[in-house]
């Protein structure tokens, strides 16, 4: 049974042991540190070890930020590097949702203030994602003197996340900040109205 099958069948302890064996055999190279820590964070989470899970998610988040900074520096310096030797930078959704999992971990640990910090960090990343990617594309476009590629970033509305607003609303309410909770609740309905294709059910009245 492989790692994915172990996870799918709920054999989380076996999945953890399997991941340890894969790490010892260098299946995960140094450049795959983000991926390895994401895997470890998720396995510890589903095993109920929320502190260890948060630790590995934090390591992944730190590496994602460092790898992104290095990639910008390479682009600005016109340094071309084989993708196979680059550190895995993490996908945008991985960078965002690791904060969601950290928030849920802190909820399990009854640390609602820390959970709120993660929920707000998730919202911050989403709100700045389009701006960040635009800057990244512009940097590469300036270095592509031959115009080999179209570096125009695509359009998306991912930054308006109903889930991040909902999580923030619940945590603001839980930590005694009803005004903030009300604002975030309004944003939930706004986000769902903006992305109706993603929600195939009728929305309840906002006042509920």
Enumerate the predicted regions with their spans.
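Inward-facing hydrophobic residues that define packing positions of alpha-helical scaffold repeats
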Residues: 18-20, 50, 57, 64, ...
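Boundary/linker segments of alpha-helical solenoid repeat arrays
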Residues: 27-33, 64-75, 126-137, 189-208
């Amino acid at each position: 049974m492989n790692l994915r099958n172990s996870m799918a069948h709920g054999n989380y302890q076996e999945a953890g042991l399997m991941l340890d064996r894969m790490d010892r055999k260098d299946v995960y190279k140094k450049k795959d540190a983000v991926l390895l820590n994401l895997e470890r964070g998720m396995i510890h989470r589903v095993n109920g070890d929320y502190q260890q899970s948060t630790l590995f998610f934090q390591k992944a988040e730190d590496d994602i930020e460092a790898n992104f900074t290095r990639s910008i520096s390479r682009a600005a310096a016109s340094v071309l590097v084989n993708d196979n030797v680059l550190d895995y930078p993490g996908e945008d959704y991985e960078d965002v949702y690791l904060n969601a999992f950290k928030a849920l971990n802190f909820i399990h640990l009854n640390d609602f203030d820390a959970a709120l910090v993660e929920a707000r960090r998730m919202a911050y990343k989403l709100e700045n994602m389009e701006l960040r990617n635009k800057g990244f594309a512009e940097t590469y476009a300036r270095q592509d003197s031959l115009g080999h590629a179209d570096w125009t970033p695509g359009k998306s509305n991912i930054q308006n996340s109903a889930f991040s607003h909902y999580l923030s609303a619940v945590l603001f309410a839980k930590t005694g900040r009803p005004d903030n909770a009300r604002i975030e609740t309004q944003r939930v309905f706004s986000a769902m109205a903006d992305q109706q294709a993603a929600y195939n059910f009728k929305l309840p009245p906002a006042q509920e």
